[in-house]
Amino acid sequence: MFNQHKVEIEWGGRPLILETGKIARQADGAVLATYGETKVLATVVSMKEPKPGLDFFPLTVNYQEKTYAAGKIPGGYFKREGRPSEKETLVSRLIDRPIRPLFADGYKNDTQIVVTVVQHDLENDPDILSIVATSAALTLSGVPFMGPVGGARVGYINGEYVLNPHIDEMQESKLDLVVAGTADAVLMVESEAKELGEELMLGAVMFGHKGFQPVIDAIIKLAEVAAKEPRDFTAPDYSALEGEMLKIVGDELSNAYKITDKQQRYAAVDAVKAKVKAAFAPAEGEEPKYTSEQIGSVFKELQAKVVRWNILDTGSRIDGRDLKTVRKIVSEVGVLPRTHGSALFTRGETQALVVATLGTGEDEQYVDSLTGMYKEKFLLHYNFPPYSVGETGRMGSPGRREIGHGKLAWRAIRPMLPSADQFPYTLRVVSEITESNGSSSMATVCGTSLALMDAGVPLAKPVAGIAMGLIKEGERFAVLSDILGDEDHLGDMDFKVAGTANGITSLQMDIKIEGITEEIMKIALDQAKDGRQHILGEMAHALTGARPELGEFAPRIEVMHIPTDKIRDVIGSGGKVIREIVEKTGAKINIEDDGTVKIASSNAKEIEAAKKWIHTIVAEPEVGEIYEGTVVKTADFGAFVNFFGPRDGLVHISQLANERVAKTSDVVKEGDKVWVKLMGFDERGKVRLSMKVVDQATGKEIVRDKRAEGEEDAA
């Protein structure tokens, strides 16, 4: 019934198994991949014919984590998986980026890849396995895919590169780098690092590329016995149309791309495009020689070639800069004075308004992942409204691109954040991209660094980011610093590097062609370092470090520690005690399992009142000390006084006053404020208090003549 095939190799000290032929047999390609005991199922379906009118490749990648994979049941009312989590979105992008450039040029058939985590051993992250499984499924599917692709994670632990570290090992690593590519070339890099140098980062990329070669060999071995017949597909040849178009508008298009202002340039390009459409419009009653989609597609190709030729031939770019010059930068802080911290970072025609907000433990984000629940205290949200590029468009929840760009900036900043002990605040940063012409994610990095320092967050060092590009034709190439949007779309590489003056904290690379050598990557990294140092210098005109004090409107947090066996006393039955403290003092209180108590308020008096209240609950009263208390109950034999937080004690009728007392109510009534001295505890542990030894007017102990005391005791 099943035509099963299986390949197994040892990879990174664990078995990697690729299986096909048993599950999801109606998909064009399906592979069940196992690494350690983590399993993912990758499926590929590509329609037999393209939809008419498409001028792009409709590829969709859906990565999904099923909670049953880790033996869990989803939370929420419906108890089933819902919208994609942030990690699912990020891994979907991670899979998409290295495979997209490898589909044949001109292939526009609707293609969907679904990757499902069906088992998680809580040791091996399924993201790398998902790249491998997808590559294998595509290689078997028969679609025109120029793979296979391999992928690997690289850590840097105790001064050595580690291939595919376990999840718990990553806590010790100074590097979290994912690299993917073919047997000959690197296509994608995604990383977070703790201020590592350029040479070390490049070494990690090459180590990872070498590390996944056995995976590519295993996929080829599986394809030799299980691959479907390749589909008949011939890339359309539009060279004749391109030649005609070049004759008609070649010079005009070249001149349009010499206009430095973005809006004026776009208007000139649109005018050229309109001329092209008019030139190829059929006469009345005639069939068109080319479809509008073909004309549009070839015009895009011609745009790319014109820009690329100009750069390679002249060394001059669209906006007139040379290859290494960074656009003019203006950095401002405190632009929104009532917020906790704010910055406006402008680089050429790219601008980010970034706002930092300080919160308490209550504001931490709870994340329920397959590996368990954890709390995130640093949040970074990137928004890209359509007005930033002079367009109208959809507004609403963030798309994949916005989530991905926000995470890239988050990775760049996180290594420089203070520890929770040093700065016990939850941090939320929002980057509003108000203008965009390339490199908005790196503007977010710069703006975030400034906004956090403006808020008084003690970053270890300021962080800046720069986006690099590449134009390569044959042996000729040009590496571009601080790329524009057009240079990103029409170039061969998008290489984003963020870091401090001392090293790299985040690196992301996407390459659209094969043949990017180690030499080119080294040039790009070195050029990016120069650009980063320049940007840090420009940012320093606004701020060089964190402000010494928090903003006027930011909450203050003080931390105290209590014994863990006292936590229940502070919280009270059903939260009664802590609610009362919050209501009466106005402070916010967060208690950790280890006894750490964080008290937050913008009012110092509220914090002090809450601290004092909690202290009285957890501290033990000392014998011989005098306390102020409140009479809570009277009886024939004395009065009960609440004198130390929730603690009550008895003042016996004989201890109410120095003279003989007939009735308790003659001396005190419920609600009276009194001073009491803790005399000790009886044999049952009950508190013994005295009022008569304390001056009720001053709260001071009454000093009596020792000889008189002796005579009184004898009597």
From Swiss-Prot:
<dbReference type="InterPro" id="IPR036612">
    <property type="entry name" value="KH_dom_type_1_sf"/>
</dbReference>
<dbReference type="Pfam" id="PF01138">
    <property type="entry name" value="RNase_PH"/>
</dbReference>
<dbReference type="GO" id="GO:0005829">
    <property type="term" value="C:cytosol"/>
</dbReference>
<keyword id="KW-0460">Magnesium</keyword>
<dbReference type="GO" id="GO:0004654">
    <property type="term" value="F:polyribonucleotide nucleotidyltransferase activity"/>
</dbReference>
<feature type="domain" description="S1 motif">
    <location>
        <begin position="624"/>
        <end position="692"/>
    </location>
</feature>
<dbReference type="InterPro" id="IPR003029">
    <property type="entry name" value="S1_domain"/>
</dbReference>
<feature type="binding site">
    <location>
        <position position="488"/>
    </location>
    <ligand>
        <name>Mg(2+)</name>
    </ligand>
</feature>
<keyword id="KW-0963">Cytoplasm</keyword>
<keyword id="KW-0808">Transferase</keyword>
<feature type="binding site">
    <location>
        <position position="494"/>
    </location>
    <ligand>
        <name>Mg(2+)</name>
    </ligand>
</feature>
<keyword id="KW-0479">Metal-binding</keyword>
<dbReference type="InterPro" id="IPR020568">
    <property type="entry name" value="Ribosomal_Su5_D2-typ_SF"/>
</dbReference>
<dbReference type="InterPro" id="IPR015848">
    <property type="entry name" value="PNPase_PH_RNA-bd_bac/org-type"/>
</dbReference>
<dbReference type="GO" id="GO:0003723">
    <property type="term" value="F:RNA binding"/>
</dbReference>
<comment type="similarity">
    <text>Belongs to the polyribonucleotide nucleotidyltransferase family.</text>
</comment>
<dbReference type="Pfam" id="PF03725">
    <property type="entry name" value="RNase_PH_C"/>
</dbReference>
<dbReference type="InterPro" id="IPR036345">
    <property type="entry name" value="ExoRNase_PH_dom2_sf"/>
</dbReference>
<dbReference type="InterPro" id="IPR012162">
    <property type="entry name" value="PNPase"/>
</dbReference>
<dbReference type="GO" id="GO:0006396">
    <property type="term" value="P:RNA processing"/>
</dbReference>
<comment type="function">
    <text>Involved in mRNA degradation. Catalyzes the phosphorolysis of single-stranded polyribonucleotides processively in the 3'- to 5'-direction.</text>
</comment>
<dbReference type="GO" id="GO:0006402">
    <property type="term" value="P:mRNA catabolic process"/>
</dbReference>
<dbReference type="Pfam" id="PF00013">
    <property type="entry name" value="KH_1"/>
</dbReference>
<protein>
    <recommendedName>
        <fullName>Polyribonucleotide nucleotidyltransferase</fullName>
        <ecNumber>2.7.7.8</ecNumber>
    </recommendedName>
</protein>
<dbReference type="InterPro" id="IPR004087">
    <property type="entry name" value="KH_dom"/>
</dbReference>
<dbReference type="Pfam" id="PF03726">
    <property type="entry name" value="PNPase"/>
</dbReference>
<dbReference type="InterPro" id="IPR027408">
    <property type="entry name" value="PNPase/RNase_PH_dom_sf"/>
</dbReference>
<dbReference type="GO" id="GO:0000287">
    <property type="term" value="F:magnesium ion binding"/>
</dbReference>
<dbReference type="InterPro" id="IPR004088">
    <property type="entry name" value="KH_dom_type_1"/>
</dbReference>
<dbReference type="InterPro" id="IPR001247">
    <property type="entry name" value="ExoRNase_PH_dom1"/>
</dbReference>
<dbReference type="Pfam" id="PF00575">
    <property type="entry name" value="S1"/>
</dbReference>
<keyword id="KW-0694">RNA-binding</keyword>
<dbReference type="InterPro" id="IPR015847">
    <property type="entry name" value="ExoRNase_PH_dom2"/>
</dbReference>
<keyword id="KW-0548">Nucleotidyltransferase</keyword>
<dbReference type="GO" id="GO:0000175">
    <property type="term" value="F:3'-5'-RNA exonuclease activity"/>
</dbReference>
<dbReference type="InterPro" id="IPR012340">
    <property type="entry name" value="NA-bd_OB-fold"/>
</dbReference>
<feature type="domain" description="KH">
    <location>
        <begin position="555"/>
        <end position="614"/>
    </location>
</feature>
